[in-house]
Design a protein with these regions (language model features):
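Residue-level detector of alpha-helix initiation sites
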Residues: 76, 136, 177-178
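An N-terminal-biased, well-structured beta-alpha scaffold segment characteristic
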Residues: 2-110
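Short glycine-/small-residue-rich Rossmann-like dinucleotide-binding loops
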Residues: 69, 75-76, 95-96, 221, ...
Length: 372
């Protein structure tokens, strides 16, 4: 198969879908790999490194989309890329379709077969291709929040860990999944007073065991959520419903009870955000204020640390990527976890959470793949 990796074009996105190490694996499986020139500059991999790994260097993204049967990316295709996708092509990347009707329309119109990293599952019920970026985003959320809390950046002017004789900042983490765990770990490591809210009592017990009393865990009732949000200096939104739009847990009305110049970091913004007042921002313009509360809602947070995140992502995506390149649609038909990753196929939505969020009919992957 001809496998192509275009350069990412989203604002300040420096990751790359294929590292040179991944290219070597595809080539070893007998595939032709095309990489757009300068696609790897953000991770310190030049064209020579890709050529040495066995890739052919394409002069433009147009060449990649025209020549290749399978496109491997990091972020969702941008409008300029939708028009270049075609019927019969495989797209393997993050999609986050539930809050994005325009991208969904573009993928439907193209006829492409689109596999979303964020909905591929594993035997334990986890999301193995989302997990590494959730780990990165969770840790980055605390770095970003700590920076936004500085007075010069519009924040309260508090240090997360405090100093002897001065109380540390209070951090509330909404959601105890992978993002929440890593946000709490980073915040607690800096000495902050951390609370995690979640609706799963088994998960709260796990977190209690992991942190051994270094953080507080609370069942996420309306009252508990209000109490934590109203008293926090930094609030991390870390809620995920796989494939679906994030629930709006913190309303506009609740902002009035929050501390002025407190900070929200909405890691769930890729799925629409879990704060009613959230809208996506960029690394070049990351924050805005609503009712005196600073909002940080960058939709591609791991793109800020591409050397770490691109390699972590490739470690996770390579196995399924090779299966797709080796066996095409048959790989999806034969693997329930890849079928869970299938979001769009030949103009039909195959993810029920996406279909429900956007008002489409959902088709079972098995009913549309037509693999003999």
């Amino acid at each position: 198969m001809r496998v192509g990796c275009p350069k990412e074009i989203k604002n300040h996105e420096y990751r790359v879908g294929l590292t040179p190490a991944s290219v070597r694996e595809y080539v070893a499986h007998g595939h032709d790999v095309w990489v757009e020139t300068k696609a790897g500059v953000g991770i310190g991999a030049d064209d020579a490194a890709y050529a040495a790994a066995g890739a052919k260097i394409a002069a433009s993204a147009k060449d990649i989309f025209e020549k290749c049967d399978m496109i491997v990316k990091v972020k969702e295709p941008q409008p300029a890329e939708w028009a270049q996708l075609r019927d019969g092509q495989l797209l393997y990347t993050y999609l986050h379709l539930a809050p994005d009707p325009e991208q969904t329309k573009g993928l439907i119109a193209s006829g492409v077969t689109a596999i979303a990293y964020e909905t591929v599952t594993d035997e334990r019920g986890g999301l193995p291709l989302l997990a590494p970026m959730s780990e990165v985003a969770g840790r980055l959320s605390i770095q970003a929040g700590a920076t936004a809390l500085q007075k010069a950046n519009g924040g309260l002017g508090v240090l997360l860990g405090g100093v002897p004789g001065v109380l540390p900042a209070k951090v509330a983490v909404i959601g105890g999944g992978v993002v929440g765990l890593h946000a709490a770990r980073m915040a607690a490591g800096l000495g902050a007073d951390v609370s995690i809210l979640d609706k799963s009592l088994p998960r709260l017990r796990q977190l209690d065991d992991i942190f051994a009393g270094r953080i507080h865990t609370r069942y996420s009732s309306i009252q508990a959520l209000e109490e934590e949000v109203f008293s926090a200096d930094l609030i991390i939104g870390a809620v995920l419903i796989p494939g679906a739009a994030a629930p709006k847990l913190v309303t506009r009305e609740m902002l009035s009870g929050m501390k002025k110049a407190s900070v929200i970091v909405d890691v769930a913004i890729d799925q629409g955000g879990c704060f009613e007042t959230s809208h996506a921002t960029t690394h070049s313009d990351p924050t805005y204020e609503v009712d005196g509360v600073v909002h940080y809602c960058v939709a591609n947070m791991p793109g800020a640390v591409p050397v770490t995140s691109a390699h972590a992502l490739n470690n996770a995506t390579l196995v399924h990527g090779l299966a797709l390149a080796d066996r095409g649609l048959r790989a999806i038909a034969e693997d329930k976890h890849l079928r869970n990753g299938l979001n769009v196929h030949k103009g039909r939505i195959t993810s029920k959470p996406v279909a429900d969020a956007l008002g489409y009919e959902a088709f079972a992957p098995e009913s549309v793949l037509n693999v003999a």
